[in-house]
Amino acid sequence: MELIVALGVIVFKVALVIAILLLLPLPLTWLERKIAGHMQQRMGPMRVGWHGLLQPVADGIKLLTKEDHIPAEADRFLFKLAPILALAPPFVVFAAIPFGESVSVLGNEITLYISNLNVALLFVFAVIGLEVYGVIFGGWAANSKYAVLGSLRTCAQMISYEIPMGFAVIGVVMLAQSMSLLDIVRAQTDVWNVVYQPIGFFVFFVAGLAEAQRIPFDLAEAEGDLGAGFHTEYSGIRFALFMVSEYVVMVLVSVLTVILFFGGWNGVLIPLPPLLWFLLKVAFFVYLFMWFRFTFPRYRYDQLMAIGWKVLLPLSLANIIISGVVFS
């Protein structure tokens, strides 16, 4: 009986996380448009619903009812598979993400995570790296020069940024002496890691912008020179899946930043519930992603490569050496 209850709890957690992640782009697209309107001294969406709150629903209905166009020369199987490959990895990663310790429900302790892996950090980097295959297959299968160029840029961008991103968290692992995300958060009960690892945080967050393919590092879908990059030929529900994937990765990078460098659900000064602290921190970094989009220009391709190899990689290596000397 206990086994059945435990399995039921796990299934409920998985279903809840999937439902939240699928619905999350709706409020985020509305928020991003409102932020854009505020920064450009206009009102943003106002027509559909009160202050445009139903605009994302209208956009979703529009995408679901549009023609699912497949180019005549495309590889149909890979073209259909690519959006799923882009969407699945960030969803799987959330299975190892803790949102808190536990809560009491009807006298039972319910943990706020699906799985507590001892090597959760390694699992996160291994799985999130698979997302790039969806982008590569989507661009190549479309048989379009703009889409292929977008895919090639994604390959180069991933190599340039995932290496320093991985190196940036080694200092955090040294401090916590564990690769478990729960242990990393518990190690920040008194002092957040960003105090000891400012260089690691800088490298991780900048590389995270590239990982999420957000401005100023959205070279794979640069509208000015590639139309829409790897998803130029996509429409309807398949295009929507790529958009959901982009927003989920943005939230994932924000969550990882909070867990690794900003104490997770550990608060300061103000006595708020741990889960609320966690959500407020994540919301701040999500807002920062959106603020960057309407503040910074897009880097050129050669500039993006130079930042990855000549700036972030040396900084991440220097951070490892400094951390090893200071915390050994």
UniProtKB/Swiss-Prot annotation:
User: Which family does this protein fall into?
Assistant: Belongs to the complex I subunit 1 family.
What is the annotated quaternary arrangement, including any partners?
NDH-1 is composed of 14 different subunits. Subunits NuoA, H, J, K, L, M, N constitute the membrane sector of the complex.
Q: MF terms per GO, please?
A: NADH dehydrogenase activity; oxidoreductase activity, acting on NAD(P)H, quinone or similar compound as acceptor; quinone binding
Species in which this protein is naturally found:
Rhizobium meliloti (strain 1021)
Protein origin, superkingdom: Bacteria
- Spell out the reaction equation it catalyses: a quinone + NADH + 5 H(+)(in) = a quinol + NAD(+) + 4 H(+)(out)
Report the main location listed first in the record: membrane
Question: PROSITE patterns of this UniProt entry?
Answer: COMPLEX1_ND1_1
Q: What does the UniProt keyword field contain?
A: Cell inner membrane, Cell membrane, Membrane, NAD, Plasmid, Quinone, Translocase, Transmembrane, Transmembrane helix, Ubiquinone
Protein name, entry field: NADH-quinone oxidoreductase subunit H 2
Its top-level enzyme class, in one word, is translocase
- InterPro entries per the UniProt record, alphabetical: NADH_UbQ_OxRdtase_su1/FPO, NADH_UbQ_OxRdtase_su1_CS
